[in-house]
Amino acid sequence: MNLEKLSKPELLTLFSILEGELEARDLVIEALKAQHRDTFIEERYGKYNISDPLMALQRDFETLKEKNDGEKQPVCTNPLSILKVVMKQCKNMQERMLSQLAAAESRHRKVILDLEEERQRHAQDTAEGDDVTYMLEKERERLTQQLEFEKSQVKKFEKEQKKLSSQLEEERSRHKQLSSMLVLECKKATNKAAEEGQKAGELSLKLEKEKSRVSKLEEELAAERKRGLQTEAQVEKQLSEFDIEREQLRAKLNREENRTKTLKEEMESLKKIVKDLEASHQHSSPNEQLKKPVTVSKGTATEPLMLMSVFCQTESFPAERTHGSNIAKMTNTGLPGPATPAYSYAKTNGHCDPEIQTTRELTAGNNVENQVPPREKSVALAQEKPVENGGCPVGIETPVPMPSPLPSSGSSLSPSSTASSSLTSSPCSSPVLTKRLLGSSASSPGYQSSYQVGINQRFHAARHKFQSQADQDQQASGLQSPPSRDLSPTLIDNSAAKQLARNTVTQVLSRFTSQQGPIKPVSPNSSPFGTDYRNLANTANPRGDTSHSPTPGKVSSPLSPLSPGIKSPTIPRAERGNPPPIPPKKPGLTPSPSATTPLTKTHSQAASLTTAEDLASSCSSNTVVANGKDVELLLPTSS
């Protein structure tokens, strides 16, 4: 098949077939991702079991030990492999575009050759004009001779016409006699025709009676058929309503099951936390008050060492609130509290609660007034402080002793680099990469090579491009209702494919620049990739973030193509209360293929959405304060 000679309808048909194949490929990819969730988690987290809190503690211990003993094989996959895949895809696209460009150039050359031939032909026509006039003169002379010959022929024909006219008169007389005879025969035939007409009238009356009876029977048959179609349509409408209600109830049941599952897991984690808190309070001794403090740059004051242990992959927000209120009471009443709190934060990915962190700063401010450690020890301990799982990156600076304590309202973190914030907000960031990034930023902050400058220029160009596209998508989605899952057979919007490509390139660029790019201060309201999609997702969902339990409106699957915190643009009619539209009924006793296709699609979409909810139930969303803004992180919980 020659692609250059295809017509417009054939090209449209070919494009529609290719688009259908692409959509089918995307569906197959999503199904395979949903099936290989366990293998994906095994590749991502290596040998550790994420459902066991003891294994999580062992992982953290090995991470801390790895800093002193030497480098080990990282747990996460190498982001360079992802970058190589992206570069390979770009090369394939470049080759394809080059082939299309070559085809366009060949067509262009062909058109140019055709135009050149037309110009040469026109030049030949103008050159042959004189020859044409000469030929016309010759033709004129020939025609004049032929005209004279035709005149002589006309004279001959006139003579023959006179002879024929005389013969015609004789024939006319004979025809008159024959016509008189024919008139008599015609009168006889008219009489017979009148008799036959009377007979035909009688037969037509009988035919009209039979037709009227047949029309009545047809009307009765049509009425019966219409009643049958109406009853069939009502039955199909009821069946479709029952199917829709069944899917809605099934989705609601799945959501309730996921919610009860997460609540049970949180209850178990809360019980474990309460037991551990009681055990830690019993084993705590007064000697713990003499521990060495660690100074961390928060405003202009120092604070003691605050260790955060990742006890479980779920968090206990009410317990932390209660303990934070107890510490606040101890600070307000002036009672001497312990220098290092005995409780451990059960946080996922190193998430720091702002209210608890403010209370911790108040306690640290009161302790700084009583005991001021030596400068060398505070600096040494500040450099050895780990960043837990890439959460709450705090810039380490030289402590400045201040006589006044911290104000109760001032809870600000020192600004970190753009690379560290992007690494922290990345869903596949590891504590090893975070510590290496902080160490490199502290050791050589002013180093910047020409290669890194080129990378940063490309990074900012991609950033401005995605920012303009995100603004357009935001304006288009602002006119719609709040996003949630849809169970009706609706078409998938192409913005999901755009968002998938945008997030893939954004994650690759963020990882690449977080390892090699220089450190730059970032304003609190800015995002390293233009528009902050996580904040947009938070504004789209006005519910508070006080509850860290995964809910269907906030938790996204780790296998989702969208970035963390961004939900699908589809809107569920099940949550709005409006049922999806009933497929149009076509006349006929058998159901048409177009009426059965949406129902099949609805079942497949419901199954895929149920799988997505199961994946979403195994994740918990947290908020990490990085560069003065909230960043949502997702981690699978114990299942």
UniProtKB/Swiss-Prot annotation:
Q: Which residues carry this modification: Phosphoserine?
A: S284, S285, S481, S488, S523, S527, S560, S563, S568, S592
Keyword line = Cell projection, Coiled coil, Cytoplasm, Cytoskeleton, Phosphoprotein
Region of interest (Disordered), residue spans: 387-430, 463-490, 511-609
Q: What GO terms are given for molecular function?
A: protein phosphatase 2A binding
- Look up keyword Cytoplasm and say if it applies: yes
Q: How the protein assembles, per its UniProt entry?
A: Interacts with CTTN/cortactin; this interaction may redistribute CTTN to stress fibers. May form homomers. Associates with the core of STRIPAK complexes composed of PP2A catalytic and scaffolding subunits, the striatins (PP2A regulatory subunits), the striatin-associated proteins MOB4, STRIP1 and STRIP2, PDCD10 and members of the STE20 kinases, such as STK24 and STK26.
Q: What is this protein called?
A: CTTNBP2 N-terminal-like protein
The gene designation is: CTTNBP2NL
